[in-house]
Each structure stands twice: as C-alpha cells, then as structure tokens.
C-alpha cells in the first residue's frame, strides 16, 4: 500500500476504535488512537500474516503488551479480514468474543492473551527465542505503553532479549506521554527510555513522529535490517490522535464517549478521511 492508502486505512482503524468503545460504553480510546498508525502499518504492510490461515506456522507474531488498547488491535484485525467489522460493536458485551483485553483462545489473529502490564513483552521474547532455537524465520513484534515500562518485568525481558541477541524481535514503545494517573514523567519517570534499551544491547530507533507513515515505514525497515541485536522503536505519538477533544487529554485514557461526543469524534474522522482523499 502507498502512503495515502495507509493513512486512509488508519483513519478507518480510528473509526472502528471510536465505534467499538462507544458501543461498549467502556474501554480505552486514548492509547488505541495514539497507536492506530502503528497498528495499521503492522497489519497492512509489515507482518507476514494470512487472515484465511491465522495459525500458519511461519506467520509473524504480534503481542499487544499494553492489552487495554485492544480496541485498536481489534479494529485493525477486523479491517484486515480476520472477523466482521460489524462485530466491533459487540466489544465488552456479554457473550461477545471481543473481550476488554485480547484473548488468544477466542479471537482470530491474536497470538497472546495480554492485559497484565509487563507480561506481553516477556511472552514475545519467549516466542523470539523459540524461533531461534527451532531455526524458524518468523519475526516477533510487541507493542508496549510508556506507562507500562514502569513495570520491572519489562526490563528483565529486555535484559534477556539483548543477552540472547534476538534480532528477530521488535519492541515498540507507544510514547504518548500520558497514563491513567497523569503525565508519565510525573507518575514514575522511565526516562531516558532510549538509553535504557541501549544498555540492554538493543538497537534503538527514535521515531520522532509515531503517527507519520513515512517515519513508521523507515523505522520498521531499519529494524528489519538490524542483525545481532533486538530492536526497540520508541514512537513519539499523540494520545487520542485524530479526535480533536481527545488529543493529549489524560481523561480519555479509559473513558467511552457519550452519544454527543461520539458524533463529534466521527465527524472529525470523516473530515480527516475526506482531506486525505483530496491529496
């Protein structure tokens, strides 16, 4: 896909996020929207996957370590063809397979159940090690939140990955600067993030604008060309990206829009999509 096509797809992913969270009357829109461009690039450009064969042995693996942003993952999976887009409206509903956090046993395309912060990266490291030991070529990607990396387990996993030189592993940090309790650097600062990963023998890519498709593409290309080290992509993003009243507002970390707010959000995204079509 070209840049415009990816941008339009990201716009659709955002619409799916807002629709799902509104229908659920609960969920985490802010961090889902900040990572929407990354979800889009992964599922429509980067990952070796097949929606018709979700468990094919040589597929690339993706672990959403910040599992509360499941609406972003679900929207990307639906648009990629893993399940009907209409099912996004059943998010968190009784009897729905689209739970509040990813469930590998019930959701096509989900490689790891997640939600307990810090555990997803550990699972991803195990997958990457398994591929190395088995001589398999698949790659493993995991997306973390910047608040999540306050968890000690993250750094145990990073230490092991760097020590084992797992160059088939890509760790992405969604550095939107906000977590549920406020600005990350005021709650419990993990900065400088880049230097911490470098200390554990990671190749680090500082992604200045994690909502820009050209920069995202360049970051993943650099990761793919890195040998002998795992890669950490530190993606500087905007919490709530794409919805005017949600951008950089910590209150939208874990709150659903009401009917009026939903209409405004969808109008914002409609206008963005129309503007992209005119480019």
Model-derived features: positions:
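Short acidic, glycine/serine/threonine-rich loops at helix termini
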Residues: 74-75, 103, 153-155, 181-185, ...
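Glycine/aspartate-rich loop-and-adjacent alpha/beta segment that forms the canonical ThDP
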Residues: 213-279
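Non-catalytic, mobile gating and regulatory segments of ester bond hydrolases
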Residues: 1-5
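Glycine-rich beta-alpha junction loops
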Residues: 68-69, 73, 176-177, 237-240
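Cofactor-binding active-site loop characterized by glycine-rich and histidine/acidic residues
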Residues: 17-21, 32-163
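N-terminal capping segment at the start of a domain
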Residues: 9-26, 174-176
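Short secondary-structure boundary/capping segments
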Residues: 80, 187, 247-251
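Thiamine diphosphate
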Residues: 109, 113-116, 121-225
């Amino acid at each position: 896909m070209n840049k415009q096509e990816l941008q339009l797809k990201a716009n659709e992913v955002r619409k799916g996020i807002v629709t799902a969270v509104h229908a659920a009357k609960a969920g985490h829109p802010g961090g889902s929207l900040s990572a929407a461009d990354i979800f889009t690039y992964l599922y429509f450009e980067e990952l070796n996957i097949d929606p018709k064969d979700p468990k094919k042995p040589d597929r690339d693996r993706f672990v959403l370590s910040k599992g509360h942003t499941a609406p972003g993952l679900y929207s990307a999976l639906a648009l990629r063809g893993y399940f009907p887009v209409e099912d996004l409206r059943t998010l968190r509903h009784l009897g729905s397979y689209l739970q509040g956090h990813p469930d590998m046993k019930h959701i096509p395309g989900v490689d790891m159940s997640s939600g307990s912060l810090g555990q997803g990266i550990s699972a991803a490291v195990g997958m990457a090690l398994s591929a190395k030991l088995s001589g398999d070529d698949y790659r493993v990607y995991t997306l973390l939140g910047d608040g999540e990396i306050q968890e000690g387990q993250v750094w145990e996993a990073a230490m092991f990955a760097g020590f084992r030189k797992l160059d088939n592993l890509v760790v992405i940090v969604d550095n939107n600067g906000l977590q549920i309790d406020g600005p990350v650097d005021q709650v419990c600062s993990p900065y400088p993030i880049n230097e911490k990963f470098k200390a554990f023998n990671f190749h680090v890519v500082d992604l200045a604008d994690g909502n820009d498709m050209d920069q995202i593409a360049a970051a993943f290309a650099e990761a793919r060309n890195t040998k002998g080290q795992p890669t950490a992509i530190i993606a500087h993003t905007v919490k709530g990206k794409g919805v005017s009243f949600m951008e950089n507002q910590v209150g939208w970390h874990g709150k659903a829009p009401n009917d009026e707010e939903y209409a405004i959000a969808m109008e914002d995204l409609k206008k963005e999509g129309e503007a992209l079509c005119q480019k």
